[in-house]
Amino acid sequence: MKPLNIIFAGTPDFAARHLQALLNSHHNVIGVYTQPDRPAGRGKKLTASPVKELAVANNIPVYQPGSLRKEPAQQELAALNADIMVVVAYGLILPKVVLDTPRLGCINVHGSILPRWRGAAPIQRALWAGDKETGVTVMQMDVGLDTGDMLLKTTLPIEDSDTSASLYEKLAEQGPVALLQALEGLVNGTLAAEKQDEALANYAEKLSKEEARLDWNKSAQQLWQEVRAFNPWPVSYFEHQGNTIKVWQTQVSETTSTAAPGTIISASKKGIEVATADGVLTLLNMQLPGKKPLNVADILNARGEWFSPNTRLANEAQ
């Protein structure tokens, strides 16, 4: 298989894993595009993306335009004379002129089985919706948002123990393998492009902190899915005793209750059971303000009086 001259475009750690796979392959990465350096941390110091750091460490030219809509940036990209552009969580829109510039166009690695979850948060939305599987799709990019023809798909079962953090890690391992397979298939002409079924498409909206507020008027099953989806960010929470209490781990209890949603049914070192609109949710790991996440046994040792049975937890949706 003849080596390809590749432009790579990506920004976060998830993308850097794919760049590393390309660097380890026989292909040539001739240029890297990534988002401009951003202020980060308490000191708001300008910080390079993980992709930029990896590219610099490997002496690969780095390009950080604020947009690819302007002609000078487009001409600069065209001058690289790439065979293909690989895009992974880049964060900038690619206009048609850019998509058409490389000989083989632009391909994207997306963290879901398309067309199920298009958009910014496919890993989180799969958990949020209670999906039984997820995976990676490599697609030929077009001007739409994750609407291009699918070149290769891999699947992965979603376990009850999975959170967004664990799925992210699994897909960050699966994605680079799929990418290299897709590049080989493109060169060999063995990939059959598959159109997406628009009727099956959903948009995976970005998560918000407000959305992470636990609404006890939902079912225990839905809240369990949300807690897993919002771990590690923005982290599910509820207001109680004037404090925001984060919830990192829960499970659906076999206990039944007719108590009003948000009512504590029981509190022991095994968990705090809370009534919901449908079923009972057991809180297993929580975080008090300014503290580290703790198992419920330690929370009760510190603030047991907050979680007495029959206490009603705050809920703005009451």
Curated annotation (Swiss-Prot):
EC number(s) on file: 2.1.2.9
Keywords in alphabetical order: Protein biosynthesis, Transferase
Protein residues bound to (6S)-5,6,7,8-tetrahydrofolate: 112-115
UniProt keyword annotation of Transferase present: yes
Any single Pfam family the record assigns to this protein: Formyl_trans_C
Catalysed reactions listed for this entry: L-methionyl-tRNA(fMet) + (6R)-10-formyltetrahydrofolate = N-formyl-L-methionyl-tRNA(fMet) + (6S)-5,6,7,8-tetrahydrofolate + H(+)
InterPro entries, alphabetized: Fmt, Formyl_trans_C, Formyl_trans_C_sf, Formyl_transf_N, Formyl_transf_N_sf, Formyl_transferase-like_C_sf, GART_AS, Met-tRNA-FMT_C
GO CC, any one term: cytosol
GO molecular function: methionyl-tRNA formyltransferase activity
SUPFAM superfamilies reported for this sequence: FMT C-terminal domain-like (SSF50486), Formyltransferase (SSF53328)
Domain of life the protein comes from: Bacteria
UniProt record similarity statement: Belongs to the Fmt family.
Function: Attaches a formyl group to the free amino group of methionyl-tRNA(fMet). The formyl group appears to play a dual role in the initiator identity of N-formylmethionyl-tRNA by promoting its recognition by IF2 and preventing the misappropriation of this tRNA by the elongation apparatus.
Protein name (database record): Methionyl-tRNA formyltransferase
Natural source organism: Shewanella baltica (strain OS195)
Lineage summary: Bacteria, Pseudomonadati, Pseudomonadota, Gammaproteobacteria, Alteromonadales
